[in-house]
Each structure stands twice: as structure tokens, then as C-alpha cells.
């Protein structure tokens, strides 16, 4: 029983570490996208935003991906492009 609990705690710690790494990656990408958008002329920003949104519209997610997840991704991309971090 103690071994089982120890294994579960170890797996939980590994998952938590993986989660932290993913959060760090997402935050790094947000910072990069924000910096890039800030250094672009307004017309270039709008062109990039239209291209990204157009690319998203053309993507058909796999049937195994829940609609909620797809919508969450679309909303997050829109938020990042239209209202970047300050």
C-alpha cells in the first residue's frame, strides 16, 4: 500500500512538473507575440491578424477534439492578437 501511494505521489509530481513547463512555454510565446505585434506598424498588425484568423477558419479539427476545446483555442488566439499582454 505504501508503495502504491509513493508511486502515485511520484506520478503526480511528474505531472505537476510537466504542467509548469507547459505554462512557461505558453507565457514565453505570449511575450514573444506581444513584442512582435508592438514592433509592427498598425497595417502590418492588421494584415497578420487577418492571416492568422483566416488560417484558423480553414482548419478542421480532428473529430476527437471536443468543440469546447476548439472554441477555447479560437478565443485565446483572438484575445492574444486583438488584446495582447501589456
Curated annotation (Swiss-Prot):
Q: What is the stated purpose of this protein?
A: Inhibits RpoS proteolysis by regulating RssB activity, thereby increasing the stability of the sigma stress factor RpoS especially during phosphate and magnesium starvation, but also in stationary phase and during nitrogen starvation. Its effect on RpoS stability is due to its interaction with RssB, which probably blocks the interaction of RssB with RpoS, and the consequent delivery of the RssB-RpoS complex to the ClpXP protein degradation pathway.
| Keyword Coiled coil attached | yes
Question: Where does it live in the cell?
Answer: Cytoplasm
Describe the family membership recorded for this protein in Swiss-Prot or TrEMBL: Belongs to the IraP family.
Q: Which HAMAP family match?
A: Anti_adapt_IraP
Example GO BP: cellular response to starvation
Give me the gene this protein comes from: iraP
User: Where does the source fall among the domains of life?
Assistant: Bacteria
Q: What is this protein called?
A: Anti-adapter protein IraP
Please tell me where this protein is predominantly located: cytoplasm
List the GO terms this entry assigns under cellular component, sorted alphabetically: cytoplasm
Q: What keywords are annotated for this sequence in UniProt?
A: Coiled coil, Cytoplasm, Stress response
- Species assigned in the record: Salmonella arizonae (strain ATCC BAA-731 / CDC346-86 / RSK2980)
Q: Which Pfam families match?
A: Anti-adapt_IraP (PF10796)
Task: Answer yes or no on keyword Transit peptide.
Answer: no
- Point out the coiled-coil segments of this chain: 1-47
Q: How does it assemble?
A: Interacts with RssB.
Amino acid at each position: 500500500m505504501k508503495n502504491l501511494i509513493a508511486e502515485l505521489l511520484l506520478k503526480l509530481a511528474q505531472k505537476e512538473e510537466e504542467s509548469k513547463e507547459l505554462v512557461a512555454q505558453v507565457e514565453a510565446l505570449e511575450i514573444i507575440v506581444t513584442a512582435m505585434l508592438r514592433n509592427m506598424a498598425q497595417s502590418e498588425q492588421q494584415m497578420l491578424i487577418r492571416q492568422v484568423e483566416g488560417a484558423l477558419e480553414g482548419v478542421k479539427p480532428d473529430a476527437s477534439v471536443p468543440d469546447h476545446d476548439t472554441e477555447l483555442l479560437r478565443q485565446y488566439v483572438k484575445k492574444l492578437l486583438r488584446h495582447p499582454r501589456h
